[in-house]
Amino acid sequence: MAAGNYALAQAKLKEARNLFNQVSNFYQDLSAVFAGIDTPIANNSRDKAVEAAQKRDDSTFQLALVHRALNQPEMSVPLLVQVLKSQQATRSLGKKAYAQLVELGFSDIPYKR
């Protein structure tokens, strides 16, 4: 993205976002299968689902920034809301997503906590 190749960045980030989402869902499913049967497997799978979801959210946030750079706020806003919903407003990435929504004028009141 630093080199300005936004089309390539969009494609790579969309692909990463989709792949990490699939991986997270697979680990969630695996965790559910072993819930109540084998706690270590269930917990390990849940932890891996969370790790993949974090990477998905990182990719989603970066994709939103690419859309901002291309002056496409209508594409950025839904992505930022998805990140905020997943991360919550109290986590670092959630705060960054909300700050972007304020900068875009989608939200009026900055979150200062």
Regions from the language model: what does each represent?
Residues 6-73:
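Alpha-helical adaptor scaffolds
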Residues 21-32, 87-97, 106-112:
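Boundary/linker segments of alpha-helical solenoid repeat arrays
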Residues 49-51, 85-88:
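Solenoid-like repeat scaffolds
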Residues 2-3, 66, 104:
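Residue-level signature for tetratricopeptide repeat
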